[in-house]
Structure formats: C-alpha cells, structure tokens
From Swiss-Prot:
Species annotation: Shewanella frigidimarina (strain NCIMB 400)
One GO CC term, this protein: small ribosomal subunit
Stated family: Belongs to the universal ribosomal protein uS12 family.
Name of the encoding gene: rpsL
Phylogenetic classification of the source organism: Bacteria, Pseudomonadati, Pseudomonadota, Gammaproteobacteria, Alteromonadales
Domain of life of the source: Bacteria
Record carries keyword tRNA-binding: yes
Keyword Endoplasmic reticulum: no
Protein name: Small ribosomal subunit protein uS12
Cited NCBIfam families: rpsL_bact (TIGR00981)
Record keywords, A-Z: Methylation, Ribonucleoprotein, Ribosomal protein, RNA-binding, rRNA-binding, tRNA-binding
Amino acid sequence: MATVNQLVRKPRTPKVEKTNVPALNACPQKRGVCTRVYTTTPKKPNSALRKVARVRLTNGFEVTSYIGGEGHNLQEHSVILIRGGRVKDLPGVRYHTVRGALDCAGVTSRRQGRSKYGAKRPKS
C-alpha cells in the first residue's frame, strides 16, 4: 500500500485499455478506397474462398476488410465504408465492409437479416 506522500509525488495511473480496431480512431465507421479486392482461404479446419478488400482509409491506415454476403460489386478504387468486427477464421482481418453504403451495393434477393446486408424490403 502506497503512503499519502508517495501518491502525492506520483499518482496512480489508470490502466490503458487496448482497442481491437485501432484504425477506426474511436469512430463507429470509416470511409476508404479499395486498393485491392481478392479472395483468401481461411484457417483450418474451414475451407472456402473468402472475399476481402485491402482498403486505404481517410486517416491514412491501410487495413483488410471482409466483404460479407453473396456476391459483391467492389473493384479497385471503389469507395466503401468499413466498421469494426473481426473474422475469426481469417488472420489479420479485423474490419467488415458495410453493405449498401457508398459504392458497395446491398445483397440482391436477400429476404432475412436484410439490415445487415443493405437489402431493401421486397415487394410482396
């Protein structure tokens, strides 16, 4: 236990919490430009071709962002919005692309969970 005099000389420092999404700078989303759109394979035991994009953000960071949903219209120089949220089986992918915002189109013919994929309500 520190004495009062020790605490006067050197106060207690609060613990600094490390963020999982440093490129967002405590913002909910960030805008960026795709520098490369490609597919990559997940860690064992999963097998697939996951769609990802390398994105240069407005704050200068260059990050890898996952493109969720079936099919996308992204290519190099597309302007997209990214949010936090890692992909567990893709090492180094800590961000998700927001579907239906800026240049990224929503998922077509999506019926359930539409808000997560930027899909409009279908005409019944």
